[in-house]
């Protein structure tokens, strides 16, 4: 894969975060739309740029590029706003939504980007939700969630 010179000047992060609550919470249509709406709004406002994503029933994996905000500034706002919106979506009464188990890795070069993209796209395969990432609906290959890429 060839990348443009200085392609990694703006920090790129591979992050994963899990949400507690009901099973299959994030793959439900209304909840995918909540995530997509927030991520697309943050991109339109040039806060971050989503490069790749995979949504599992209780976890989201993202490769994001910092634009106007650092990960440390963007993440708490995203975390709190989406947890509140998921709770208020009315899908399941009495469920308290909280993001936890945040993992993050700074992608420093093309080799790391390729490795992280592979890991992100193969999450559904390793977790048993698909046999091939190309057949999994909720990722940046098929983009059923409608996240701007």
Stretches with model-predicted labels:
Residues 1-149:
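Short catalytic/metal-binding and nucleic-acid-binding patches
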